[in-house]
């Protein structure tokens, strides 16, 4: 039986047909050839992009952490005696976050943002959540994407006063402007995450005897949910996933408002938060079963 017919056969390689002394031996590579020089430049460019990507990931992580700290600080506003002190401190923290975003804008200067968007999207979403949470506490309204982007325009004056990252002398001498635009998807995802923080603020405010905030939050969340419903499944995949979480937050807030309206006079104020937490757990269990 031939090698081709047998199950364990093998095919000879083409160079096996040549005598050993006639095989082509590998030549020494000329490192100074135009082809090698071109590939070396490609290697340097790819390494530079990978390094930039890693720096952006680190900055995005810092933005996420500081934004979360700002959100935790703002949650203290339901129990703090002076709301203005909390808002002032939160503004200082957000200024620090914006300086991190300034460094991102400098890294992306002259680059296509979409090539590095995946590295910074998490931080931008968390920043949108923090700044929109602060804006809601101040005005009981939703901050627009244009307002957020106006806060992310930086000049060399910002670089000299607040930003500590090194820059070239030519760049310092020339009056320049850096900006970073929050994309519509980042904005929508940040607003969707905001609804969860508003739900927590609603429950905490009830525990402190504030019965007006839940109704204000409920009305606001209904408007946000209606807006997201217009997008539905036609928008980005991440937005459609957030829609379910938004609906959960709205249901919990509406349940709290219902209990306040119907049973508010029966339950002491210091026990309302416990009642709502129990009802919230029941809603979570029902949704988990379904």
From Swiss-Prot:
One Gene Ontology cellular component: endoribonuclease complex
Record: residues binding Mg(2+): 129, 197
Cell compartment(s), UniProt: Cytoplasm, Perinuclear region; Golgi apparatus; Nucleus
Glycyl lysine isopeptide (Lys-Gly) (interchain with G-Cter in SUMO2) cross-link, renumbered residues: 279
Any one GO BP annotation for this protein: siRNA processing
PTM notes: Sumoylated with SUMO1.
Segments for region (Interaction with C1D): 73-208
The keyword Ubl conjugation is assigned to this record: yes
Role noted for this protein: Acts in combination with TSN as an endonuclease involved in the activation of the RNA-induced silencing complex (RISC). Possible role in spermatogenesis.
Protein name: Translin-associated protein X
Gene label: TSNAX
């Amino acid at each position: 039986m031939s090698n081709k017919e047998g199950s364990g056969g093998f095919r000879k390689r083409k160079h096996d047909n040549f005598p050993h002394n006639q095989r082509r031996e590998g030549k020494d590579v000329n490192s100074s050839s135009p082809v090698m020089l071109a590939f070396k430049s490609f290697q340097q460019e790819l390494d530079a992009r990978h390094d930039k990507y890693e720096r952006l990931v680190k900055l995005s992580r810092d933005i996420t952490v500081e934004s979360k700290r700002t959100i935790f600080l703002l949650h203290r506003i339901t129990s703090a005696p002076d709301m203005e002190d909390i808002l002032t401190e939160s503004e200082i923290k957000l200024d620090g976050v914006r300086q991190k975003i300034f460094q991102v804008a400098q890294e992306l200067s002259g680059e296509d943002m979409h090539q590095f968007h995946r590295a910074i999207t998490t931080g931008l979403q968390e920043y949108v959540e923090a700044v929109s949470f602060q804006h809601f506490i101040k005005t009981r309204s939703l901050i627009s994407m244009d307002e957020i982007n106006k806060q992310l325009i930086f000049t060399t004056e910002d670089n000299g006063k607040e930003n500590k990252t090194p820059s070239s002398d030519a760049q310092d001498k020339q009056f320049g402007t850096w900006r970073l635009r929050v994309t519509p998807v980042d904005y929508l995802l940040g607003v969707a995450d905001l609804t969860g923080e508003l739900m927590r603020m609603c429950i905490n405010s009830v525990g402190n005897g504030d019965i007006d905030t839940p109704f204000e939050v409920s009305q606001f969340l209904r408007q946000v949910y209606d807006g997201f419903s217009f997008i539905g499944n036609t928008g980005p995949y991440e937005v459609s996933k957030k829609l379910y979480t938004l609906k959960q937050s709205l249901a919990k807030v509406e349940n709290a408002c219902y209990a306040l309206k119907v049973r508010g006079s029966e339950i002491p104020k210091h026990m309302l938060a416990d009642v709502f937490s129990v009802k919230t757990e029941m809603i979570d269990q029902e949704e988990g079963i379904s």
